[in-house]
Amino acid sequence: MAMTVHVDIVSAEEQIFSGLAEFVALPGEAGELGILPGHMPLMTRIKPGAVRVKRPDQAEEELVFVAGGILEVQPGLVTVLADTAIRGKDLDEAKALEAKRIAEEALKNQSTEIDYAKAQAELAEAIAQIAAIQKLRKRGH
């Protein structure tokens, strides 16, 4: 049997995933992070993007989109506290493309620094959702 670590992915609304995993990959603040069983304790912010979870009983990785949040790694436990989390199968490409278009339009028409920062964050989230959808499409879902 492969070594595993318990993974919890939660948002403010609900628990998205809870189970054993052989591997977890996610977008950390300084780049892509890969977590294997036995990883050193760690706490870091995560950026919008796809969290990939390799379960021991499945060939396909589970994909969860997160809009940022916090990652905590402890011995035997990986916890993702996401601002927003959406299961890969629940992502809506048309909605993400529309959010991207609106954010790009807001960037062109911003009136204050706050508007600009908000539009940038919304654009980054929409782009990350689209990238997650494209990963799913490549896998044939």
From Swiss-Prot:
Subcellular localization, as worded in the UniProt entry: Cell inner membrane
Gene Ontology CC entries for this record: plasma membrane; proton-transporting ATP synthase complex
GO molecular function: ATP binding; proton-transporting ATP synthase activity, rotational mechanism
A Pfam family it matches: ATP-synt_DE_N
Protein's membrane topology: Peripheral membrane protein
Keyword entries, A-Z: ATP synthesis, Cell inner membrane, Cell membrane, CF(1), Hydrogen ion transport, Ion transport, Membrane, Transport
UniProt xrefs under CDD domains: F1-ATPase_delta
Keyword Lipid metabolism among UniProt keywords: no
InterPro entries in alphabetical order: ATP_F1_dsu/esu_C_sf, ATP_synth_F1_dsu/esu, ATP_synth_F1_dsu/esu_N, ATP_synth_F1_esu_C, ATPsynth_dsu/esu_N
Family: Belongs to the ATPase epsilon chain family.
Described function: Produces ATP from ADP in the presence of a proton gradient across the membrane.
Subunit structure: F-type ATPases have 2 components, CF(1) - the catalytic core - and CF(0) - the membrane proton channel. CF(1) has five subunits: alpha(3), beta(3), gamma(1), delta(1), epsilon(1). CF(0) has three main subunits: a, b and c.
Protein name, per record: ATP synthase epsilon chain
Organism: Aromatoleum aromaticum (strain DSM 19018 / LMG 30748 / EbN1) (Azoarcus sp. (strain EbN1))
Lineage, top ranks: Bacteria, Pseudomonadati, Pseudomonadota, Betaproteobacteria, Rhodocyclales
